[in-house]
Amino acid sequence: MSMAGWITIGIFFLCVLALTRPLGGFLVSVLEGRRTFLSPILGPVERALYRFSGVRPEEEQSWSHYALALLSFKIVCFVAVYAILRLQAYLPLNPAGQGSVAPDLAYNTAVSFVTNTNWQSYGGETTMSYLSQMLGLTVQNFVSAAAGIAVAAAIIRGFARRESKAIGNFWVDMVRATLYVLLPISVVLSLFYVFEGIPQTFSGSVVATTYEGIHQTIALGPVASQEAIKMLGTNGGGFFNVNSAHPFENPDALTNFVEMISIFAIGAGLTNVFGRMVGNERQGWAVFSAMSVLFFVGVTAVYWAEAHGNPAFSAFGIDQSLGNMEGKETRFGVAASALFAAVTTDASCGAVNAMHESFLPLGGMVPLINMMLGEVIIGGVGAGLYGFILFAIIAVFMAGLMVGRTPEYLGKKIEAREIKMTMLAVLCLPLVMLGFTAVAVVVKPGLAALSATGPHGFTEALYAYTSAAANNGSAFAGLTANPYWNITLGIGMMIGRFFVIVPALAIAGSMAAKKIVPPSSGTFPTDTGLFIGLVAGVIIIVGGLTFLPALALGPIVEHLSMLRGTLY
């Protein structure tokens, strides 16, 4: 662990902190329909979209209509992406002559990008045409992220409004998030990435001759534009198979730093949106503070584990001064790789600049735990905030039980309906993560995909289903997905996305209809250090202890075995 590494982590956090309030203010203006500096340019486009699609922006929706609109849109998106992938061989912009995608892989990929997971059971440069990458996958990177922002906005309105049946209009929220937030920032990021050397071309692959006289095919494509929204929208699906470890996706330390900032930017800004819209900015900073505490715990743990190197190698006299460099790029090193791993799994991004499977057992366990906690540490675009609010509801419910009074959050009483919806959303994740893993490690198709045995093989399976249910998309790359995995992972992605969103919207509708209760001497304050500690504790206890037995069978046992000289 070096001073340079800690300085990198510190500067990264300060940059995120500096962006939180200004970006939060801009997001509030966009979501509330106020005039912004982009309105003269994009206002006519927004109004034209409403006229063309028949949307009446002044008409708001109840939570059930909001959820129905979202689910209907997602079904259309799934069908569109699936059709593009299945017909790929007959569509233009396919200079490499890629064939049509197999049915199970097309299903898995369509579900993956529609749910903002971006799990990839394929290598992008060897499977997808340029049209599929742009029209199919990149479009979903925009609209899936916009849907997350829309849901977060709807839930915030649920707490901010009183005696209201409406929580907003899904179509309006999604259009505004796409037009005013995601597209403009992505354009700026794309230009920066092109300047840094990331390709943006429709030309086909280039054949080069190496120093050894061997011919090598170098894949190109419209990479920069996809890279921008891939990070900003916490999507994570790479244009190339090795994702952001590829020099054409992430060429140097500067692009690596900007990509990490992009992952956290909107999620951090939404915490400020929360505070502003409920009328108390301190509430937003309390949420951000709780997330930050958990972030530093995680990044410290993974950095410590990777910086100390592999003790089994040290026994052979191998120099470990650089830490565990297996699976890492020398242009980034251990510190930047550890930070990237923490950031991408704190958010539901899933992009990687190093191979998580090559991390040491405890180092690989940290990204796994981040996902098991529901990725509420900043989290995915929108998803992190509403996931955190679910845990905040549990925290104030527990606090209410301890003092013998009806729990309240932001002046709204937390009653049986809200607790039932919260537990439905919270419990569906471990059900998928643990249940599907248990089945996969005892059936032949499940075992056939694993490249390792023992605890490491178990961790491969556990990581895959955890990543799918958490809508992250990163993987222990030794797993070779077959039709069994493609189908079951797709099911896990849908449950992890929509079995959280729908209960969260139901809570928003219920809270919007309630009166705001004036605070009293018995009201539990939710903008103090006590609340921050309580929520962090609930996240660790409720989220973490659920998975302790599974972690004991995987990375913990593997770590203890490694100390005795046994590697997997």
UniProtKB/Swiss-Prot annotation:
Coiled coil: none annotated. The keyword Cell membrane applies. GO terms for molecular function: P-type potassium transmembrane transporter activity; potassium ion binding. It is a multi-pass membrane protein. Belongs to the KdpA family. One of its GO terms (cellular component) is plasma membrane. It holds the Pfam family KdpA. Keywords: Cell inner membrane, Cell membrane, Ion transport, Membrane, Potassium, Potassium transport, Transmembrane, Transmembrane helix, Transport. The keyword Transferase does not apply. Disulfide bonds: none annotated. The gene is kdpA. Its main location: membrane. It comes from Granulibacter bethesdensis (strain ATCC BAA-1260 / CGDNIH1). The chain crosses the membrane at residues 7-27, 65-85, 136-156, 179-199, 254-274, 285-305, 332-352, 354-374, 377-397, 423-443, 487-507, 530-550. It is found in: Cell inner membrane. InterPro entries: KdpA. This is Potassium-transporting ATPase potassium-binding subunit.
